[in-house]
C-alpha cells in the first residue's frame, strides 16, 4: 500500500524532521519513546492520504455503512500492525536499521490502547480489520477510556489493579474531531406539548444535565488496498468549560461539577457495579457513546439524503452484546422527537436498521437495569421502552392467548427491571450467536420463547480472528514459512488457502522446519518470562498455556488443581518418567470478582511452591504472566504447544483464543464447547484432545440434578488429597483459611448456587487422563509435529474475513468499495 511510493531516504528525512519539530532535538538525543512518536507520525501521514481518499470514495459511491457499536475494542499496538497492512513493515525496518534504530524496540514503546478487556473487544478489533481489508464501509463506535480497565500488577501473589495511563504520552494515531461533538443529556423530566391545530404531541426534556461527546478518530488500515476505515471513540467534556463565577463566589463544588460529570463517564472500562453508583455510571457510559454515535450517523446520512425513511438502505447498526442495545430506544427517540416521525414510521425504520449479536448464555452478562435507575437517568428513553414493551406484550397475548407464563418470560419490563437483551431481540431484525453450538443453545434453551415466536431473526456467525495480526505480526517466522510452502502470499487475505499446507504433513524436512520455528518462538517467550517473572523455563518442556479472562466457567481452577495433582505424583513417585511441563497462565479478574482473584492467588501460591522445589529437578514449572494483553498474547500464541480451552461445556459462547493457538500450530486440549466443536470438525478428533461432559450432559445435570461432588471427593483419593490441600496449609504457608472459600465452592452449596457449579470435580479425572495422552503424543516427536502442522493447515475457516463476509451476505448487505490512488 505504501510500497510503490516508499522511499527510504525520504522516510529517514521525515523521521529526522519530526524529531526536530516535536522535540527540538536530533535523532542522537531523543529517547526511545520520542523516536516511537516521531516514526508513528510519519506513518500516520501516509495513512491520512489514504484515509482522505477512502472518505472521498465513500462520498462518491454512497455505500451502505455498518456502525459497529461495542463497549470494547481491544486493538493491540498500532505501529507494527499498520505497517504490515500498508505492506511497508520490511522497508521501514530496514530504513530504521540504517539509522541505527530497531523497529521492534520502538514498537515496545507503544502502550496497548486500554479500550477493551477480553474476547469481546478483541473480536471487535478483528472485525474492523477485516471490514477494512475486504473493502466495506464501516465505523467502529466506542468510548475513549482514560484508564481502560486496569493495569494488572501481581504483588505477593495477589492481583492489584493500577490505573492504565495509556494516554500519558498522547496517542500519535488518533485525531480529535471537535467539529463533530454532540450533546448527550441525562436525567431531568419530560414535558408533553400538544399542538391543538395539528393534534401532534411533542416531548421535551427539561432540567437535565448534559455533557459534550467529542470524537477521536482512529484509523483502521485495510490490508494492501488503500482503504482506511474509522474507529470513532468518544471523549466526554463539560458543556460549559469552567464556572468561574461559582469559583469566585466560593462554590468550588459547583464550579467543578460539570468537569467531574464528564470526567467520570470516560474514566474506566466496566466500573465496579457491585453498588448503585457503579451501576449508574455503567448505564451513563453506554447511553453516552450510543447517543453520540447515532446522532453523528443520522447527521452523516442527512447530509446526502433527504428521505429519512430510506435510512435502512444506507445504514445498519450492529450491537456487539447487550451493552449498546439502548441504541434501539435512542434511535426511536431521535426519529420521533428530533425528526418528527410517527411511531409506526419510526418503528419500521428502527426494526430494519438494528441487529444484535449475543455473546453469552451466562445470565449475569445479559444486562438488566433497575427500572428506578433507568427511568431517572434516561426518562424519555424509558418512556419509549414502555411503549415498545406494551405493544410487544399485546402481540404475545395475540399469538399465545391465555399464556401469561410466556408473557412473564419474554417481557422487556418485568420485576422492576429493564431486560436489554429482550429489547434488542424485539427491535432487531437479526439476532446471531457466535458459534454453532452457542446458537443452538440460544434457540433451544436461553432464548427459546423468542426463537419460537420469530425464528427468522436467528442465525449463527461463528467468530474468527485476523491472520494479519496473529500470524503475520505475531509470528513472522511462521508467516514466512507458510508463504514459502504455499508459494503465495494470498493466504493473507484468504485463509482457506492454508489447507495447501496439508501436502507437507509427511515431509520430514518441512516438519523439522515447522517445529524449529516453534522452538525459536518458545525461546522468545522463555526470555520474556525470565525478564518479567524471574523464572527460568526450559523451552524443551511442553508449554501448556491457558490465557483468557479469569472466570469460574473458564476453569483456570481445574487447571491449577491438576498441576497440584501432578506435583503430588512427581513427589510420591520420583522414579516415574515424566516429560517436563511448563504451565503458563495469563488472566485478569474483574476488580470486584473475589473468587476469581482467589484463583489468581492460588495459581501464584502453587507456582511459589513448585518452582522452588529443587527435588523435582525442574520437571514442573508454573508461570503467571502479569497484565495479559494483546502485545504479550502475540508472543504467547506463537510459543504454545498446548491450547487449554477447558470451559464447562455449554458456557463458552465461542472463544477466539482457541483459533489463535490453532493458527500458530498448538493442538486444542478442551471440552466440546463453543468453537472447539467446529475446530475439532476441521482438524479431526485425532488431532485434538477432548475430555469432559458434553453440553447436553451439563444442561441435564443443571435442570434435573443428579450430581453430588461429595461422591467423587469420597471415592477418589487423588482428588480428595488435592482438594484437602486447599485447606491444610500446603500452599498457604500454614494458613488453613486462605483458600477455604475455594474449597467450599467445590463441596458445599452456597448462596443459592449448587456445589461445584462448574463441574470441576466431575471432569477432573477425564481431564487428568487426557493430559496423560498429551504427554504420550508429545513424546512421539513425529506424531506431534504432524498434529501441530495439521492444526495450522486446518484453520482456514476461522478467519474473521470469513465471518465478516457472512455478516455482509446474511445481515448487513453491504457493497464493496475500491479506492484507487
Where are these regions (language model features)?
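A conserved ligand/cofactor-binding region detector
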Residues: 1-821
